[in-house]
Amino acid sequence: MRLKYLSAVLLAAGLATAALANPYETTLANGLRIIVKEDHRAPTAVQMVWYRIGSTDEVDGASGVAHVLEHMMFKGTPSVGPGEFNKRVAAAGGRDNAFTSRDYTAYFQQVPKEKLEDVMQLEADRMRHLTVDAKEFEQEIKVVMEERRMRTDDNPQAKLFEQMNAVAFQAHPYRRPIIGWMNDLETMTAADAKAWYDTWYVPNNAYVVITGDVDHKAVFALAEKYYGPLEGRALPARKQQIEPAQEGTRRVNVKAPAELPVLILGYKAPILRDIDKDSDPYALQMLAAILDGHDAARFNKKLVREDKVALSAGIDYDNTARGPGMLYLHGTPSEGKTVADLEAALRAEIARVQQEGVSAAELKRAKAQLLASEIYKLDSMFGQAMEIGQIEAVGLPYQKLDRMLEKLQKVSAADVQAVAKKYFNDDALTVGVLEPQPLDGKPRRPGVATRH
């Protein structure tokens, strides 16, 4: 059994390295980077265009403009009418969409490989020739405001998380919601969106990731043909905003119509800045897997099944970002239990790791689970493009993705115990509590993915 497990891990590690073994890269004269990962398992191709611009680059009073511009990118150019982009991709037998984060904005198409040239032409066209029409903007800003109502204002958990971030970060722009504050959306104009586009949507602030059944030399030639003629432009200097050190616990209580209370404990946590030299982010990722990486992990086993103090309990930690990091413990108390009971139980589980450490068996299983999840990401062409694009977006080299897996596998039980002692302290803690209020009779509308 032990030999079978070891073989599976080694095989998975080998597959991970192979999956990212052949990316090829070139940089056009205008500064646009083209990254190609050949994968000939299926006759399809994925194109992802990543702009190094997200909500973190916005200013107070203009929150949400990055996301609004993402919507406007589907409203046409002089040669492609409003909504025509989606129709052409669908007619080619493909799918497309886009997403905005704190750190980047990305657009993708997955199409039969022979249609790659068509979607490359479409993306190159809107990279510099977007039409920001005032009437189209007025319609789309209403769509975005409704999206905010659905995803945040009518979603108590999302509202709590938004308020927590606004308190946890006092100076850094991560305090602002990606979708924007409603007042900023109400006062935003087409000129604001156009200024954002003109400033940041240039080849030297973007990179293109293409994966699939393609030849990298042929892709480079297509990129030169369609993206090459676009002119680059000097970018404004980005002034880094440093978050002041937190000097005590902060608490946020949100009252909203809901059936159940929710608790979130948010701790300031390190971010991966150097893949080779850093160690704590890997150990925290492993700790998260031990606490909440599978059905038999500590939170589910102890808090949900055995002690029945929680209906659910989990942990969220992303160790890559342009800005500062947070680690969140969260849950909903069981019937007859309070938020205070749940907070005490979560703290007790962290204290147990701090005092007793973790077992070799737990660490072994967590490593296997983490490795399996990473391999799963790389199983699809879209997943490979996402993995490459996201790591580049936060300033880390995609060439070292396999090194990240190696570093995870080297995390020791002592490393896990050390980070539990180091980062779970109350001076770096923000506590958020959702206090449920009587339901108002309005239907609680679930958030839905926006289709452009």
Regions found by a protein language model. Name each.
Residues 18-22, 246-248:
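Short acidic, Pro/Gly- and aromatic-enriched capping/linker segments at domain boundaries
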Residues 46-49, 262-267, 432:
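Active-site-flanking beta-strand signature of metal-NTP-handling nucleotidyl enzymes
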Residues 149, 166, 235-296:
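His/Glu-based metal-binding/catalytic segments typifying zinc-dependent metallopeptidases
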